[in-house]
């Protein structure tokens, strides 16, 4: 039986709280069960040097975990003097995922940075970050539309992400830490609301998985993301 007696295709309880901080153009607290991430969107009227003069905008992301977001205290990466490989991989994934939902030409020569700060980790921090940052990004775009900076909405659609895996021989959706730590297969799927996939990251931690199991995992991810899109729409309607 899964933790909290969840069905195999049932994500953890999802909660998205908008306008969570005061200063950012968009801010969200996203909760996937006990995993909690603050996502803020910051708008700047400039772009990276490689984009200057091209009439296009940019969306990027940074990711970090508070020292006591986990069971034992982690040293801050700032104290170490460099970012770890996991951090860089995750923030690039978040940035790629969010760029897929934006028409960068319609955004104009401005950049939006999504900061995803994990305040409590219980598995799925990268998928929660993407799902919450999507809403924060939309709020930042709405801010630009409302003040007249933008006249065309550059948002193509919602983006959400969820983990799936094989645990004790069973395919399951939205793994929490106790499942993730023993999973035979672990996969993260990022999807647009029209069903197209942005990224699939899958690894066999033990026994290799079959083609049939892969298709089952992707179907579970689609079912899970559809529930996340509902949660995003509900939050954006509030």
UniProtKB/Swiss-Prot annotation:
Q: What class of enzyme is it?
A: transferase
Q: Which Pfam families match?
A: RNase_PH, RNase_PH_C
What Enzyme Commission number(s) apply to this enzyme?
A: 2.7.7.56
Annotated phosphate binding lies at: 86, 124-126
Keyword Transferase: yes or no?
yes
Which InterPro entries does the entry link to?
Answer: ExoRNase_PH_dom1, ExoRNase_PH_dom2, ExoRNase_PH_dom2_sf, PNPase/RNase_PH_dom_sf, Ribosomal_Su5_D2-typ_SF, RNase_PH, RNase_PH_bac-type, RNase_PH_CS
Single GO MF descriptor: tRNA binding
Q: Which UniProt keywords apply?
A: Nucleotidyltransferase, RNA-binding, rRNA processing, Transferase, tRNA processing, tRNA-binding
Entries under Gene3D superfamilies matching the protein: GHMP Kinase, N-terminal domain (3.30.230.70)
| Gene Ontology terms: biological process | rRNA catabolic process; rRNA processing; tRNA processing
State the coiled-coil residue ranges. none
Enzymatic reactions: tRNA(n+1) + phosphate = tRNA(n) + a ribonucleoside 5'-diphosphate
- What top-level branch of life does the organism fall under? Bacteria
**Which Cys-Cys disulfides exist here?**
none
- Presence of keyword Metal-binding: no
Q: HAMAP family attached here?
A: RNase_PH (MF_00564)
Q: Which family does it belong to?
A: Belongs to the RNase PH family.
Q: What is its quaternary makeup?
A: Homohexameric ring arranged as a trimer of dimers.
PANTHER family documented for this protein: EXOSOME COMPLEX COMPONENT, EXOSOME COMPLEX COMPONENT RRP41
Stated role: Phosphorolytic 3'-5' exoribonuclease that plays an important role in tRNA 3'-end maturation. Removes nucleotide residues following the 3'-CCA terminus of tRNAs; can also add nucleotides to the ends of RNA molecules by using nucleoside diphosphates as substrates, but this may not be physiologically important. Probably plays a role in initiation of 16S rRNA degradation (leading to ribosome degradation) during starvation.
NCBIfam families reported in the protein's UniProt record: RNasePH (TIGR01966)
Q: What is this protein called?
A: Ribonuclease PH
Q: Which gene encodes it?
A: rph
């Amino acid at each position: 039986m899964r933790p909290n007696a969840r069905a195999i295709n049932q994500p953890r309880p999802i909660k998205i709280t908008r306008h969570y901080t005061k200063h950012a153009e968009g801010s969200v607290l996203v909760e996937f069960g006990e995993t909690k991430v603050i996502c803020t969107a910051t708008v700047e009227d400039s772009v990276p040097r490689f984009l200057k003069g091209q009439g296009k905008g940019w969306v990027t992301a940074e990711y970090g975990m508070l020292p006591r977001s986990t069971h034992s205290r982690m040293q801050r990466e700032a104290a170490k003097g460099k970012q770890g490989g996991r951090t860089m991989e995750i923030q690039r994934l978040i940035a790629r995922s969010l760029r897929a939902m934006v028409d960068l030409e319609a955004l104009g020569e401005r950049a939006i940075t999504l900061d995803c700060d994990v305040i409590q980790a219980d598995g799925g921090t990268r998928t929660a970050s993407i799902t919450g940052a999507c809403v924060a990004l939309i709020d930042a775009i709405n801010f630009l539309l409302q003040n007249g900076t933008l006249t065309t909405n550059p948002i193509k659609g919602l983006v959400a992400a969820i983990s799936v895996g094989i645990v004790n021989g069973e395919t399951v959706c939205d793994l929490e830490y106790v499942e993730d730590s023993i999973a035979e297969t672990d996969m993260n799927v990022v999807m647009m609301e029209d069903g197209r996939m942005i990224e699939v990251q899958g690894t066999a931690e033990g026994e290799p998985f079959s083609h049939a199991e892969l298709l089952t995992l992707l179907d579970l991810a689609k079912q899970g993301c559809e529930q996340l899109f509902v949660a995003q729409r509900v939050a954006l309607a509030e």
